[in-house]
Swiss-Prot record:
Essential for the replication of viral ssDNA. The closed circular ssDNA genome is first converted to a superhelical dsDNA. Rep binds a specific region at the genome origin of replication. It introduces an endonucleolytic nick within the conserved sequence 5'-TAATATTAC-3' in the intergenic region of the genome present in all geminiviruses, thereby initiating the rolling circle replication (RCR). Following cleavage, binds covalently to the 5'-phosphate of DNA as a tyrosyl ester. The cleavage gives rise to a free 3'-OH that serves as a primer for the cellular DNA polymerase. Residues 119-128 have a biased composition (Polar residues). SUPFAM superfamilies: Origin of replication-binding domain, RBD-like (SSF55464), P-loop containing nucleoside triphosphate hydrolases (SSF52540). It holds the Pfam family Gemini_AL1. Keywords: ATP-binding, Covalent protein-DNA linkage, DNA replication, DNA-binding, Endonuclease, Helicase, Host nucleus, Hydrolase, Metal-binding, Multifunctional enzyme, Nuclease, Nucleotide-binding, Nucleotidyltransferase, Repressor, Transferase. InterPro entries: CRESS_DNA_REP, Gemini_AL1_MSV, Gemini_AL1_REP, Gemini_AL1_REP_central, P-loop_NTPase. Residues 175-187 are annotated as: Oligomerization. This is Replication-associated protein.
């Protein structure tokens, strides 16, 4: 089985997909039909599966899949069939891949109509004007369909449209980021509950259940949590141990906002430097933010709570107007730490032997 680490780094996006199933004795027709059903959302156009005998005597299976819309997956086991795991590649030259598949097959099955790859976006100049030159839209459509990475996408644009690439690079980079977003790694808490055990007040346990551990119901809003107290008490460690979250310290950076996060953490940021504080504290949905080095965007498609952590010297409540304080208290559970309070239990030391 692939490791979770390799699975987190996997990404495939293309209209042409080449699959190789090693040591696979399955019937090509059955595999073809199963793959066709798997990729239904991307509108499959053609598939061919061929079985061949490997040098070691085992049966291998090769498949070429063509879809109308690019297959976009981040799960390396998406194409697993009956426990058989394939090697997944982008077929950059579908003509050569198909020829390779049909080299020495023992059994073959096809469905749909094969779509040969054009030899060049710009056509064959040796044919003069007899062949219509593709439009800019057609060339871009080909680039979008066949590019397999951000780097390849920008390289193809640079080759086909050098002037546009030089003068409008920021727009192409923006579209590249949309087509090939950064893969979100599987969340592993940087502060898992361990020894010494993390703990919290009973009143906060009552807040945790409906706001962190229960899913958001449509039409309902969560409640945020404000914790103020001294430094080095473990409150940040405790807050970060609860699950997948957006974490901001020193400043709020919307460019890295993760919609899959369960909650947000604002840690040690003065009240006056926290943009959209009302939206965060009020667990509001679908509000617009303005990243420092990016375009405005809508975030937080569902209500999620924010845990605000502050020290006594930067208590948010001391900086608020009466109206702001009223809103804050109505939308936030406020917890002021007691003297000597910690968010972890001290480690149990082994008994010392008497001398």
């Amino acid at each position: 089985m692939a490791s979770s680490s390799s699975n987190r780094q996997f990404s495939h996006r293309n209209v042409n997909t080449f699959l190789t199933y090693p040591h696979c004795p399955e019937n090509p027709e059955i595999v073809c039909q199963m793959i066709w059903e798997l990729v239904g959302r991307w509108t499959p156009k053609y598939i061919i599966c061929a079985q061949e005998a490997h040098k070691d005597g085992d049966m291998h299976l090769h498949a070429l899949l063509q879809t109308e819309k690019p297959v976009r997956i981040t799960d390396s086991r998406f194409f697993d069939i009956e426990g058989f795991h394939p090697n997944i590649q982008s077929a950059k030259s579908v003509n050569k891949v198909r020829d390779y598949i049909l080299k020495e097959p023992l059994a073959v099955f096809e469905r749909g109509t094969f779509i040969p790859r054009k030899s060049s976006f710009q056509g064959n100049p040796s044919k003069g004007n007899s062949e219509k030159k593709p439009s800019k839209d057609e060339i871009m459509r080909e680039i979008i369909s066949h590019s397999t990475s951000k780097l390849e996408y920008l390289s193809m644009i640079r080759k086909e449209f050098p002037y546009d690439w030089a003068t409008k690079l920021q727009y192409f980079e923006y579209s590249a980021n949309k087509l090939f977003p950064e893969i979100q790694e599987e969340f592993i808490s940087p502060h898992p509950p361990s020894s010494p055990d993390l703990l919290c007040n009973e009143s906060i346990k009552d807040w945790l259940q409906p706001n962190i551990f229960q899913p958001t119901d449509e039409g309902t809003r969560k409640q945020s949590l404000y914790i103020v107290g001294p430094t080095r008490t473990g409150k940040s460690t405790w807050a970060r141990s609860l699950g997948l979250h957006n974490y901001w310290q020193n400043n709020v950076d919307w460019s890295s906002y993760n919609e899959d996060a369960i909650y947000n953490i604002v840690d040690d940021i003065p009240f006056k430097f926290c943009p959209c504080w009302k939206q965060l504290v009020g667990c509001q949905k679908e509000f617009v933010v303005n990243p420092k080095y990016g375009k405005k965007k809508k975030v937080q498609m569902k209500s999620k709570p924010t845990i605000i952590l502050a020290n006594w010297d930067e208590d948010w409540m001391n900086e608020m107007t009466p109206g702001q304080l009223e809103y804050f208290e109505a939308n936030c559970m406020i917890y002021k730490m007691s003297p000597g309070e910690k968010w972890y239990s001290p480690p149990v030391l082994p008994p010392t032997e008497e001398v």
